[in-house]
């Protein structure tokens, strides 16, 4: 699928586990477009944040079941990417947390 660079990365994931990975392994977590490939994620992160990406790992998270009264619905599945940066580089967006 042909995605624009700004459409690949949706938002950063800021959780306790993601923070531990960021500090220990230089891994940054993002929610990405469901159809984005690892190559597209790498290119998007390198262009948007001006860093060098060494590795990209992706996982698809299942959407949770949600209830409103007796009606049961489901949130959509989504994809997350764990991006490892070159030694000494960081993304300023995560530094304020």
From Swiss-Prot:
The keyword rRNA-binding applies. Keywords: Ribonucleoprotein, Ribosomal protein, RNA-binding, rRNA-binding. InterPro entries: Nucleotide-bd_a/b_plait_sf, Ribosomal_uL23-like, Ribosomal_uL23/eL15/eS24_sf, Ribosomal_uL23_CS. Gene3D superfamilies: 3.30.70.330. GO terms for cellular component: ribonucleoprotein complex; ribosome. PROSITE patterns: RIBOSOMAL_L23. GO terms for molecular function: rRNA binding; structural constituent of ribosome. One of its GO terms (biological process) is translation. The keyword Glycosyltransferase does not apply. It comes from the Bacteria. Part of the 50S ribosomal subunit. Contacts protein L29, and trigger factor when it is bound to the ribosome. Belongs to the universal ribosomal protein uL23 family. One of the early assembly proteins it binds 23S rRNA. One of the proteins that surrounds the polypeptide exit tunnel on the outside of the ribosome. Forms the main docking site for trigger factor binding to the ribosome. HAMAP family: Ribosomal_uL23_B (MF_01369_B). This is Large ribosomal subunit protein uL23. The lineage of its organism: Bacteria, Pseudomonadati, Myxococcota, Myxococcia, Myxococcales.
């Amino acid at each position: 699928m042909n995605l624009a660079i700004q459409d690949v990365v949706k938002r950063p994931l800021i959780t306790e586990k993601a923070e531990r990975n960021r500090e220990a392994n230089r891994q940054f977590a993002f929610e990405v477009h469901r159809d984005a490939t690892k190559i597209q994620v790498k290119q998007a992160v390198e262009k948007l944040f001006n860093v060098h990406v060494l590795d990209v790992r992706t996982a698809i998270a299942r959407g949770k079941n949600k209830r409103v009264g007796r009606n049961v619905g489901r949130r959509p599945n989504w994809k997350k990417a764990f991006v490892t940066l070159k030694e000494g580089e960081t993304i300023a967006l995560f530094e304020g947390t």
